[in-house]
Amino acid sequence: MRENDILFFNLHRRYLNKSSNYGGFLGIFSLAAFLNQNGFFAQSFAGQLMEGKKLIDEACSQRKVSMIGLYCDYENVTENIFLCQYIKREYHLPVIIGGPQATALNEDFINKSGCDVIVRYEGELTVLSLMNYFLNGIGSLEKIKGIMFKKNGKIHIQPEQNIIENLDMLPFIDDECYLQSNLNNNELSIMTGRGCPFHCTFCHEGHHTRKVRFRSVKNVLSEIELFLNNRKYARNIYILFTDDTFTLIPQRVKDICEGLKKLRKEKDFNWFCEGHIHTLYLHPEMIDYIAEAGAQRIQLGIEAGTQEVLDAYKKGSTIDEIKFVIKKCRDAGIQQIYSNIILGGAYFSKEIYIKNLAFAKELLSLGKGTVEIGVVAYWPLPETDITNNPQKYSIKILDKEFLTANGDFAQTETNELTRWDISFFMQDMEKELQKYMQKMLKNNEIPTKRVLTWFPQEATLKSIGRWWYCLSKMPHLLAYYNILLLGEAKTLKDISLNEILSVHPMRVVSLYLYIEKISSTTIKLFDCILTGIEKDVLVYSTGKMSIENIIKQLSIIYNKYSYDELKNIVLNTLKKLEKEHLVVFSKY
């Protein structure tokens, strides 16, 4: 560990045995890059609480750090109180707090944590001034913009800091910004702009509506090119565009996508972006640009399945626009189209839930294996219109401090529904959508070609979507499609009539694991009921005999049938088995 002027940490408990997705948390690494550019030594770490505490102990006990910065969001307020108390007690270092929750923190937080300063909004210019103040004794807190602090028993909230207009002046995040080496990480999160022109009533970013600023296309592509050059021999590279305004300007999207196509010719990678429904509806050509440039996944801000709630959220989109964009993304070839449906938000009721569920199922049908719907509870993020005025939206907020949930349990109630009721609706919706996806798979509503794209070709979680997890819970379908993917067998529609009798039917699962006895003459294999001669066709479907030979073998047992009658029975049985994804057909 090198000596640093400041270390930044974004730490969370391993709640629910889950690790937060730190890939998109650029803030503390961007701060480190900016400070390094301006003559200081800074590094950052994002990870689990106890792992981070060990790194803090190592740095502080060896006197390799002069100052600590902690990232605070709605989930880790209590972690930051503990860490700040610990650092101040054990090492007596200045501690500053920043992040999206910073504007909601108050005197009580300062008193409990003992932090020196809270940084509000954009941090680069403010933190640079704080470094000069704490380490070089330059200036005074009273003259630094964008902070809150307590002095002589009084809370001071300073005017907002000036925003950085020219984002191209910000340095790229490099490996020197990481407390632990990042060179083995093949995932790049990249921000192409700041600010948001939209005013979603549930969104922290939308509340502040700070001026939208963009990096130049050349600057964005240069960062990606540098990342790729540093990983010439890496595989499974994934680029995440994390800003909500990626699809705001059509020409800019076109220019970025043209650049991405050129870069992918040199070094292939998958990528993800966010998309705004209304702008994509007005300019659907952007979807073509994104798809042609190889985007694997797009996240759309849908949030609700009724126009009343969409309007309450000020989404600026309509139900018909959502369906149009979904179909356009599907037809353009984007493999994964993700969005959330919020439960427990504006005007929530049982009726709204039923409409949300029906709309989610409609989107799954439209997507034909591309659409993924996440179920989330409304989060009372700080300073949003719903959080500030819940009565306007017919809800009550029970836990603004996120003390009882981190997205896994409802934090609101209505006059008719408790938080438990809303949480049961969340559970029900997850189950219903899972069943609906399984039904679509069983009914062959998803093109085989698309199903085969779900299989992870390499060891990368980014290639795996919800449809893959759904498929993986259905052993016969998983085996059926895997055999097809490997080219070891075909489906009946891929076999010509003149060769049909020469192919070898082959079961895809072990019988003893999944057969159920219905009666002395009838069995059930998953959803397929088989009786009499059908059972024997299944038994002989081991890939060792052609259909012609199976017919001959069965003619010995069932000699009351003519050859043509037996042929029809066998072929119809095999069609039945294939429809249920229980057999495939090998050429040899």
Residue spans for each PLM region:
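Flexible glycine/acidic-rich beta-alpha junction loops that bind and position SAM and/or redox cofactors
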Residues: Y15-K18, F198, Y238, E308, ...
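Glycine-rich beta-alpha loop elements in corrinoid/cobalamin-binding modules
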Residues: F34-L35, F41-Q161, E383
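Catalytic cores of alpha/beta
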Residues: N106-K112, M286, Y347-E362
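Glycine- and acidic-residue-enriched helix-capping/strand-helix junction motifs
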Residues: Y15-I28
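Radical SAM [4Fe-4S] cluster-binding motif and immediate context
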Residues: G23, D168-Q336, L343-G345, A358
